[in-house]
Amino acid sequence: MSPSSHKPLILACGLPLSGHIMPVLSLVHGLTDDGYEATVVTGRAFEQKVRDVGADFVPLEGNADFDDHTLDDLVPGRKDMAPSFDRTVQDVEHMMVATLPEQFAAIQRAFKKLSASGRPVVLVSEVLFFGAHPISLGAPGFKPAGWICLGVLPLLIRSDHTLGLDNDRSPEAHAKKLAMNHALEHQIFVKATAKHKEICRELGCTEDPKFIWEHSYIAADKFLQLCPPSLEFSRDHLPSNFKFAGSTPKHRTQFTPPSWWGDVLSAKRVIMVTQGTFAVSYKHLIVPTLEALKDEPDTLTVAILGRRGAKLPDDVVVPENARVIDYFNYDALLPHVDALVYNGGYGGLQHSLSHSVPVVIAGDSEDKPMVASRAEAAGVAIDLKTGLPTVEQIKEAVDSIIGNPKFHEASKKVQMELESHNSLKILEESIEEIASHDFGLLTKSDEETEDIPVKGPALAVSS
């Protein structure tokens, strides 16, 4: 559809990591197809993908311009750290908080460009793009008509009863979670929280932000969680701006089948294995999965390496019943798949279940344990509770998924639930609601500035 001058403009933002920006781009693709004009702020590694969905591109600068494969350069000592909570804390401080000024500056550059139209601009960001926070806190600069935040991770907002870990509502669990809630803000993320407040003040904010993990949930005009209710633990007192929106829309893409595509179509059983794009060491999961399934009768294993040009190590022998490809269209393969073995990314779970495919999860970094616990509670997964599963663990889990119809039945229910939530429609309704209210056109705050400076001191996060 041709762009419409009657629609509000869209400014979308996301961390330059596949699991964060790709869900945003999927929705932007739908918006541009429906006649919206969109601009996207993210890292240069994703510029072509931004342009491919019909959007204009504004790059992040400086340390904010990282990607999936350069994080070890951004976070001191990261490459020598095993996946752990300590590494997550370091990632938050350096990847999300310290880069906030550069993110905010990029948003302001984009707003300045869009302001000439005189049309309302709606800001759409993902939950960990903290550069959107100062806009809700009185910082000087251009303001959008409103802010919509997208939940591309399991819910991070705290609750007296869940903490996002399980559905246990016993008195003992309640006390434990209250203590953990306090520890998250006042011990574990105390340095990141302090730096977050300091940076916001340096940028001219007139209010302090909420707790670092929760500000986006509370301050956004609309918060759209990209999952169905069944993939979250029950919660008390969710904010009034919160809504479950289902998974991101599917888009038709050109598909050129590989030479072995006939093997997929003729196989009695197809198992897909991938490790995504972020935490990638193929000997952690892909290689043991190939080994675990090499003698399974009537089974074809398809391994997707997740990056164009990627290859398995030279010493890996690919079994006869396996096919390995660097990059592949999930939507083309998943309709033929009986089970997915992967490392627990949030988007991968949604993608798999949109095709009613149950999963085996082997992940212990980032948000992957949270994803796995939700998937297992929903009955659509087996959580191996490790990022380094043995061949035997993988084989037993795949056999259980294939041999017990309850997993496919539960996956089908979630698929139907996902289909009942049209995320693009929900987003467009939210955009139009915001644009139709009397928020005014894109304006500057009282303290007008031509350019928002990136202050040097705010970029330094002490070790």
UniProtKB/Swiss-Prot annotation:
Presence of the UniProt keyword Glycosyltransferase in the record: yes
Catalysis performed (reactions): 18-hydroxy-(9Z)-octadecenoate + UDP-alpha-D-glucose = (9Z)-18-hydroxyoctadec-9-enoate 18-O-beta-D-glucoside + UDP + H(+); 17-hydroxy-(9Z)-octadecenoate + UDP-alpha-D-glucose = (9Z)-17-hydroxyoctadec-9-enoate 17-O-beta-D-glucoside + UDP + H(+)
GO molecular function: hexosyltransferase activity; UDP-glycosyltransferase activity
Disulfide feature: none
Keyword Cell inner membrane listed: no
Entry EC number(s): 2.4.1.-
Pfam families to which the protein is assigned, alphabetical: EryCIII-like_C
Induction: Induced in early stationary phase (at protein level).
Xref: InterPro entries: EryCIII-like_C, UDP_glucos_trans
This protein's UniProt keywords: Glycosyltransferase, Transferase
Family: Belongs to the UDP-glycosyltransferase family.
Function according to Swiss-Prot or TrEMBL: Catalyzes the first glycosylation step of sophorolipid biosynthesis, the coupling of glucose to a hydroxylated fatty acid to give rise to a glucolipid. Can glycosylate all hydroxyl fatty acids generated by cytochrome P450 monooxygenases CYP52M1, CYP52N1 and CYP52E3 into their corresponding glucolipids. Main products are 17-O- and 18-O-(beta-D-glucopyranosyl)-octadecenoic acids.
Protein name: UDP-glucosyltransferase A1
Annotated organism of origin: Starmerella bombicola (Yeast)
Lineage of origin: Eukaryota, Fungi, Dikarya, Ascomycota, Saccharomycotina
Gene: ugtA1
